[in-house]
């Protein structure tokens, strides 16, 4: 079923691409856009995970670099019956995490230094279990392709403003059509992202709670991440907003959780669903699930040469 949804998503995104191409250059522009979309879909399928990890300058770690973090992912992957994904750390004080990859055999999980430093062992396990659930449900392919194509559609819409309005380019709709393309194409891409992310986050929350065995640890983590995510900026996410739906909590500082156009469900609704799940589990168990009250363990964060306590990450080639 996920493969069918992914195919429908790619078809819709391709149609958007072609529509903007038509506005820019008529039938010829539409055909060029079709070829571009086909090439981009092919390239994104094989490379979008690497592109996203590169956007966030994620660094791969192993058991020697981050034994506790790596061990959490390894044990949870075993619980879920999944191959061991590649494990990455993102240099960002904002607590957050995401998963990417075209299938469970070629998947990766990434957590920020802020998450590893501010959450308890059990809360980190809940977050990583959520990300492994996305991998198990093959959401990662759809989310990563959506991020890549939505960003491209937005850029093409801006391109239309500069090259779609003059009369010599075979544009059948004129400047009005260009304005429509600039507004409608990115907005439609955003609606697709919303529909994908909102429905899949609930499923990943539930499956993640099953994998880690404690819904309340994940609920506690969501509350902490949501509380910090909009107070601590993620500069790379601000530069690449099309990837926001990939994170466990929206990383954009301007995002309000009650916003009609949020890429994520309301955090309190997610927490309430996990608390209901905990009560259901408690009813069938002699050891009821409890909130995470454990003292936060000291956690080794990989020695990557990153600064600590800075308000802005080091500048990279995209800055």
From Swiss-Prot:
**What is the official name of this protein in its record?**
Protease HtpX homolog
Q: What family does the database annotate?
A: Belongs to the peptidase M48B family.
Q: Where are the transmembrane segments?
A: 6-26, 28-48, 145-165, 172-192
Question: Per its UniProt record, what InterPro entries does this chain match?
Answer: HtpX_protease (IPR050083), Pept_M48_protease_HtpX (IPR022919), Peptidase_M48 (IPR001915)
How is the cofactor bound, in the record's words? Binds 1 zinc ion per subunit.
What molecular function terms (GO) are annotated for this protein?
Answer: metalloendopeptidase activity; zinc ion binding
One GO biological process term is: proteolysis
Quick one: which residues bind Zn(2+)?
130, 134, 201
Q: Which residues form the active site?
A: 131
**What cofactor(s) does the depicted protein rely on?**
Zn(2+)
Can you name a GO cellular component term?
Answer: plasma membrane
Compartment(s): Cell inner membrane
Q: What is its EC number?
A: 3.4.24.-
HAMAP family the record matches: Pept_M48_protease_HtpX (MF_00188)
The principal localisation class reads membrane
For this protein, the record's Pfam families field holds: Peptidase_M48
Keywords for this protein: Cell inner membrane, Cell membrane, Hydrolase, Membrane, Metal-binding, Metalloprotease, Protease, Transmembrane, Transmembrane helix, Zinc
Specify the superkingdom.
Bacteria
UniProt membrane topology term: Multi-pass membrane protein
Organism, by scientific name, is: Sinorhizobium fredii (strain NBRC 101917 / NGR234)
- Annotated spans, Disordered: 279-319
């Amino acid at each position: 079923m996920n493969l069918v949804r992914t195919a429908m998503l790619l078809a819709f995104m391709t149609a958007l691409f072609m529509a903007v191409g038509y506005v820019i250059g008529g039938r010829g522009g539409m055909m060029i856009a079709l070829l571009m979309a086909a090439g981009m879909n092919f390239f994104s399928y094989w490379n979008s995970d690497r592109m996203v990890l590169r956007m966030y300058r994620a660094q791969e770690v192993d058991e020697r670099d981050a034994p506790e973090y790596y061990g959490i992912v390894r044990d949870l992957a075993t619980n879920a019956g999944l191959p061991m994904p590649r494990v990455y750390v993102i240099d960002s004080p904002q607590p957050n995490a995401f998963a990417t990859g075209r299938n469970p055999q070629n998947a990766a999980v990434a957590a920020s230094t802020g998450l590893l430093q501010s959450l308890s062992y059990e809360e980190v396990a809940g977050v990583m279990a959520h990300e492994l659930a996305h991998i198990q449900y093959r959401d990662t392919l759809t989310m990563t392709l959506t991020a890549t194509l939505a960003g491209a559609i937005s850029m093409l819409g801006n391109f239309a403003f500069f090259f779609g309005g003059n009369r010599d380019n075979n544009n059948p709709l004129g400047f009005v059509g260009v304005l429509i393309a600039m507004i409608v194409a990115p907005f439609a891409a955003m609606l697709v992202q919303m529909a994908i992310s909102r429905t899949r986050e609930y499923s990943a929350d539930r499956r993640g709670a099953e994998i880690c065995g404690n819904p309340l640890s994940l609920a506690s983590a969501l509350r902490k991440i949501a509380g910090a995510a909009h107070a601590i900026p993620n500069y790379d996410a601000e530069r690449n907003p099309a990837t926001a739906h990939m994170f466990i909590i929206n990383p954009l500082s301007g995002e309000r959780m009650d916003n009609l156009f949020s890429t994520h469900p309301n955090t309190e609704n997610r927490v309430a669903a996990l608390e209901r799940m905990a009560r259901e589990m408690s009813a069938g168990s002699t050891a009821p699930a409890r909130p995470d009250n454990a003292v936060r363990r000291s956690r080794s964060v990989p020695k990557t040469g990153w600064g600590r306590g800075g308000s802005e990450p080091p500048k990279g080639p995209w800055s």
